[in-house]
Amino acid sequence: MKLYTKTGDKGQTGLVGGRTDKDSLRVESYGTIDELNSFIGLALAELSGQPGFEDLTAELLTIQHELFDCGGDLAIVTERKDYKLTEESVSFLETRIDAYTAEAPELKKFILPGGSKCASLLHIARTITRRAERRVVALMKSEEIHETVLRYLNRLSDYFFAAARVVNARSGIGDVEYERSAIVFRDRNSSES
């Protein structure tokens, strides 16, 4: 099988159920998800073989598969919607966010992306996720999409934030606090809401 088909040489690409321009919001959406998936591969390469990160490594690999599902779900434009991404994937992210938030030091101020190299990579993944989310929101204003994709991306950016903080904590590196930040987050044990 050849990697090239020449069918996209005039600026269009194939979807499940049709063709569209390569600069369409749909292609921009799943293209940004593909970019994110590639970047996670870089973070995985950085984590590879480092002790104490086996859970995160396994999760990132699972997320790569789920992002592939997101891209596939966004490429469906037929009446028959054989979506792959499930609400269980969203719930899993929520569980991990809660666990990582509990493990990391208490957050009191805004933080800057940074700390360890791997945490910095996860912060970049977070920002790419937010861009993908913005593209999907723009797409859903004009076309039907699998709405679980949007919920998943929204949780995923929070997951990357929490995971980056845990990577720093496990590495013995503190978060980089924004120097002009006041205390903006309340004590976890505070009864005030």
Curated annotation (Swiss-Prot):
The disulfide bridges present are none
UniProt subcellular location: Cytoplasm
Q: Where does the source fall among the domains of life? A: Bacteria
In alphabetical order, the GO MF annotations are: ATP binding; corrinoid adenosyltransferase activity
Q: Where does ATP bind?
A: 5-13, 22, 130-135, 154
Q: What UniProt keywords apply to this chain's record, in alphabetical order?
A: ATP-binding, Cobalamin biosynthesis, Cytoplasm, Nucleotide-binding, Porphyrin biosynthesis, Transferase
Q: Which GO terms describe its biological process?
A: cobalamin biosynthetic process; porphyrin-containing compound biosynthetic process
One Pfam family hit: Cob_adeno_trans
Kindly list the GO CC terms recorded for this protein.
Answer: cytoplasm
The primary site where this protein sits is cytoplasm
Pathway listed for it is: Cofactor biosynthesis; adenosylcobalamin biosynthesis; adenosylcobalamin from cob(II)yrinate a,c-diamide: step 2/7
PANTHER family xrefs: CORRINOID ADENOSYLTRANSFERASE (PTHR12213), CORRINOID ADENOSYLTRANSFERASE MMAB (PTHR12213:SF0)
State the oligomer form and interacting partners: Homotrimer.
Q: Which family does it belong to?
A: Belongs to the Cob(I)alamin adenosyltransferase family.
Q: What is the protein's name according to its record? A: Corrinoid adenosyltransferase
Which species is the source of this protein?
Bacillus subtilis (strain 168)
